[in-house]
Amino acid sequence: MRRFLFWSLCFCLLFPVGLSSCDGSDSAAVIFGGTTGELTWTLTEDGVLTITGEGPMPDYRDGGTSETPPWYPHVNRISSLTIGEGVTRIGDYAFMLCSFVTEVVIPESVTSMGDWAFWHCQSLKRITFPDRMVRFGEWAFYENESLQSVCIPEGVTTIPSSAFARCHNLTCVIMPGSLQTICGGAFSQCHKLTDVTIPDGVTVIETGAFPSYLDMAG
């Protein structure tokens, strides 16, 4: 018995891969990964997509081109998203069609977000913006049908065209005092958005920014 224990311990020390079973760790294995621009990404077997590093994320294209995000071929495996502190920008089309992600917390290091960044993330119910974010792109949250509330951070001056269009379950939008412009289609077809308070600093509300029935209080 002593000899068996001795060799078992030697095996664990000599082969670190086996440590997960020796120490009881149950962390999920990385099944895909690589680099994108200055950043690194991994996708684990339990569906967690993690982006780490320092700097901006590149801009990508939609699913009909060769310039899609590197994790796009595995989009149906992604159930959770972790963006690491140090990432400064979320690129165009970065997380399009991540249909099983339910919540996203964007780190404080991110100051801007590209167009179509979270397009058609049908299960996304909540997104937390960092205080430092000053810009997000057109169509950024288009067709996020489960999104229920949005608190836009202070510092944002423009809500771009169709940014939250077709978010059918969106009921609450909190707008910052820094806001100046609400572009056309920003909240188009948000059928459950029934009342919005417009900050005093808003000087431009373009045609079709809100559903036609909406009663806006300024």
What are these regions (language model features)?
Residues G18-A28:
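Sec-dependent signal peptide cleavage junction
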